[in-house]
Each structure stands twice: as structure tokens, then as C-alpha cells.
Amino acid sequence: MKKILCMLMPYGGHFYPNLELLRLFVQRGAQVVVYCDAKYQECFPEGDIQVRDYPTAIREYCGHMASAQTDRKRAAREYFSYMADARIYALMQIEDLTMNRMMVEALGAEVADLNPDVFFCDAQASFLAQLREQIDCPQFELNASTFVPALWRSQRFQQYYQEILWTSYPDSISFDQILSLQRKRARRDKRPPDRSFGYLSPLLQDEAERLPATDQMLGFHLELHPQAQRAGVYVSRGTVCESYGAFLLEETVQALAPCGESIHVSWGGNPYSKQVLTQADFPENVHLHAYVNQIKMLENSKVFVTHGGITGVREALFAHTPMVVIPANFPDYQVGQAIEAHHAGILIRNRPLDAEEIREGYVELNRYYEDYQAGAAAMAAELESYWNAYGAELVWKACELA
């Protein structure tokens, strides 16, 4: 019996993509322990998988919310400072090292007692680096997002810096300084994973040719029911709580409101977005929601306006719903590039946001709607094809060989 230990980020967007994989492990007779958020234990009512909480300090670190901002420039500064402000970057590295030490102290002995045959970690869980050095078994990454090439190897990152980061935050450190900091951080990773598995396929992965050979695309599978008769626009920027995204969401809705279509906006439980949206003056065709059934909304909406988060994008592709992508961070910008390149939507590039550019993108989607819908369907078909060819079975084969 294989003993498998998984350590995931404690968010739904990082847990649910791995659900089918975790169930396959159990079906193949593995003993599975998952560190994430214990509330997901309900997904395994028979108790055949243990889902455990991280220490409180780690959960708080992962769930950190940015402070509320009323000034748009200050909100942008806070959002981009993790990458573009050398002082903030240094402070975040210190905090990250503190969390790494805490993980070793809190769970080092527990993990040693588990003595796993195979270890899986979330690709975004930087607080696991020191603990991973103590785990003496094959290690694999599970990537719920898109693969990001080393920034100094990426041609796309320079475009992102010029189009999004610098224009949103002109006080940013230089492009070369950012690359220098990223190289320095990469040298700290003393135990790279043996392989990294992502729920992607080539059409959805920007700069695939710049990824290491150890990055493996698994594809993805969803059972959705795209509706033939569609109407309206669905707008969301996910559930992350920060003010910069709240302002982008409000500006996006203001730009689209004159189109006359019914516009449904989800603020995803983000209190900052709720405050900004409920104080805004929108016409009657704009409908605000804390949460929605996103699958149903995507199946019935004509257009999805998104920040480019991979979970919502995959759902939109399987719903055959074309997208307008308005990214903030680099992975979402990559997703937007892939969506636009394969004719499943349009990427909005100008910052500050240009209402006319957003409206023109929306008009463009509607003018050639069948073509864009076909592009989304083609990307979904490739994801499905890759899942059937590789998918969870490929990961299990890696476990068997470990």
C-alpha cells in the first residue's frame, strides 16, 4: 500500500482541481493524508482520506487580506508591491522564511512519523521549502494554476511589465531589478520537485516551449451543459480580498453598463469589492451578487468578463463561453494571452483601464460570436483529450514507479 502525503494551499481553487486525483489514489489502494483545510473532509464522507488543518499561523498567512484602500493609486501600489517594491519584497521573504521554520517545528515530526512513499506539494506553497528538504522520498508538484517559466527566460514577462505592471505602478523597481530578485529567490530552492503536474493542455499554456521537461500537462475534465440560447454578461474577479481588484471590477462594470445587456456581477465575498460596487451608481441592467452558481451562470451567459483566474477560465471553456480577460498578475496575463491567441476571447491590455477598449472588445466578441465560441470549444476539447490520454492516471503511474 502506497502512503501518499499531499500538502495543498487551503483554498477551494487549489483543492477541488485535485479531487478526482485524490479519489483515484484511494481507488488504487493508497493511504492518503492531505494537509489543506479540514472543512474539505466532507468531500470524503467514508473517511478513506484524512484532511488535516495547517497550524493556525500558516492558515492566517495563506488567508492574509490586503488592507482596505480608498485611493486607487495606493491600492495599485499595495497590490504590485510584492514584486515591484524591493523593501516590501524583502519583508515578504523574511515572513516566508519564518513560516518555513514554523512548518518544520510544527509538522516535521508528524510528517516523519507518516513516512510517506510519495509526497505531493502545491506549486504555490512556498512555506513548504524547508520541510521538503527533510522528506526523503520522491516529490511531485500539483499546480492548480498555469505553469510560469522562470521570469528571466520569459519573453512574455517583459510585455507584462510594460503593459500592466509599470503602467499600473510607475514607481516600480526596474525590469532588470525584478529579474535579479527572482533569480536570487530561485537559488534558495534546494529541492526542486521531480515532476510538476498541471491541469492544462498546450492551447491553454502560454510559452509552453520555455517550460522545463519536468512540467507535465494533464488536461482537465468537466461535465457542463452549454446552452444554445444565451443572453447577458457575467463579470467576476474571483474571491481574493484586495482593493486593487475591487476598483478594476467597478471600472469594468461601468464600462460595460451602456451596452444595455443584462450584466450579472459577482464580488465573490470580497468585502472591498462589495463596498466599492454598492457605493457606485449603476443602471438597472446591472445586478450585483455576493456569490453565484458560476457553472450555471457560464452555461447561460453570452460573455464572461474575467481577471483570467484559471479555475473560472476552464469552466468558461467547457461552457463554450467566450471571454474578455482583464488581468492583474502575471499568471492571469499568461492565461489571457493563450485565450486571445486561440480565439476564445480578447485580452485587455491598457492600464489604467480604458472603457472604450473594454467596450470594443465586447463588441468584437459579439460581432464574431460563433467564431469565438468555436475557439473556446476547441480549447475545451483539447483539455478533455489530454485528460483522457494522461490525466490522473499519469500521476498514479508516477506514484507506482516511485
Model-derived features with residue positions:
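Conserved donor-nucleotide binding/catalytic region of nucleotide-linked donor-dependent transferases
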Residues: I346, R351, E356-A380, Y386, ...
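Catalytic donor nucleotide-activated moiety binding site of glycosyltransferases and closely related
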Residues: E250-H287
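C-terminal alpha-helical cap of glycosyltransferases
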Residues: W387-A402
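Short amphipathic alpha-helix
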Residues: F15-V26, Y40
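Nucleotide-sugar-dependent glycosyltransferase catalytic domains
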Residues: K2-K3, A30-V33, D37-E261, K397, ...
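Short beta->alpha connector loops at strand-helix junctions that form conserved
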Residues: R52-E60, N143-A144, G308, V325-N329, ...
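A short, glycine/small-residue-rich beta-strand->loop->alpha-helix junction that serves as a flexible
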Residues: C6-L19, C241-G245
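A donor-sugar binding/catalytic signature common to diverse glycosyltransferases
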Residues: F119, H289-A338
